[in-house]
A protein has these predicted regions:
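Long, contiguous amphipathic alpha-helices that act as assembly "spine/axial" helices in icosahedral shell
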Residues: 94-161, 233, 238-246
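Sequence/fold signature of self-assembling virion shell proteins
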Residues: 14-43, 190-261
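Short, surface-exposed recognition loops or helix-turn segments adjacent to catalytic cores
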Residues: 7, 11-31, 146-165
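Short N-terminal helix-initiation segments at or just after the protein's N-terminus
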Residues: 54-57, 126, 130-131, 186-188
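Assembly/oligomerization interface modules of large self-assembling protein complexes
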Residues: 18-108
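Internal, well-folded beta-alpha domain core
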Residues: 143-187, 191
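Short, intrinsically disordered N-terminal pre-domain segments
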Residues: 1-16, 86, 260-261
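Alpha-helix capping and helix-coil boundary motifs
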Residues: 1-4, 12-13, 124-131, 162-168, ...
């Protein structure tokens, strides 16, 4: 399955409709990227979604070589200028550039596996299972993006959120977003009716039990554009097994751009 191309959904039979209510006798294009983005809380919060094909390897003639090509996500802080008295050296400032490299060859594998029985195919809506699984897989990639990035952030044991800490990271208030996990820590409905955590605009996520606040626009998730889909017949009863393999990873240039509630 190629995530960089539109996917065709067949017309629905009479009386059975899918999520986007396709009229009988028509087809519609499903944009994989749009579905993934719509179902990823970290992307909605500002994180980049990288879906791009590997760059073709250059020609090295007849020489045997090992070739590895990495991509880069870079976050750039403002340069720290300081007042310098006459005759003194300029002070050494911290490096304002934060890089995170990744490559498709080293991206981890993720898999989804499901069993489809003959009864599932014969039930009402069974002839739409292919389209339903296609949508489920794309939505699952959105939640996979959430899980990978939030795991990477929490693995760095972020500090407790304060507005002062956000200011120290050159943040604007409008850049900050919060994702409230299953424990609901710090969640509240403000006086204007908006959902917030520690005063920051928030959204719910099932990818963690923690509440993460940060500058998601300074991070990304990379998903390899091809999915490997395997369908296997299990027995003479008509049961089949569906396995989908993906490659995705979080790309986090600077974990200090995130905090917990």
């Amino acid at each position: 399955m190629d995530l960089s191309r539109a996917l065709k959904l067949d017309a629905t039979p009479e009386g059975v409709y899918g999520l986007n209510m396709v009229p009988a006798g028509e087809t519609t294009d499903l944009d994989p990227r749009s579905v993934i983005e719509a179902n990823s809380r970290v992307v909605t919060a500002g994180a980049g979604l990288i879906i791009s094909h590997p760059k073709p390897a250059p020609s090295f003639g007849g020489q045997p070589v090992f070739y590895h090509d990495d991509a880069l996500v870079r976050s750039v802080d403002p340069a720290a200028f300081a007042t310098v008295a006459d005759g003194t050296d300029a002070p050494l400032s911290p490096m304002p550039i934060h890089d995170a490299a990744f490559g498709w060859a080293t991206t981890p594998h993720q898999a989804f596996r499901a069993k489809i029985t003959r009864a599932d195919h014969r039930a009402v809506g069974g002839d739409q299972l292919n389209e339903a699984f296609m949508i489920a897989v794309l939505r699952g990639l959105g939640e996979l993006a959430d899980a990978l990035l939030l795991q990477a952030i929490l693995a760095a044991t972020p500090a407790a959120f304060t507005f002062g800490a956000a200011a120290a990271r050159h943040a604007k208030y409008d850049e900050l977003r919060a994702l409230v996990g299953t424990a609901g820590t710090g969640a509240e409905i403000s006086g204007d009716g908006s959902f917030r955590a520690k005063g920051v605009l928030a959204e719910l996520t099932a990818a963690t039990d923690k509440t993460v606040i940060g500058l998601f626009n300074r991070a990304a998730v990379a998903i390899r554009p091809e999915l490997s889909v395997h369908v296997k017949r299990l027995n003479v009863n008509g049961d089949t097994e569906l396995i989908v393999f993906a490659n995705a990873q979080a790309v986090l240039p600077n974990a200090s751009d995130f905090w917990t509630a």
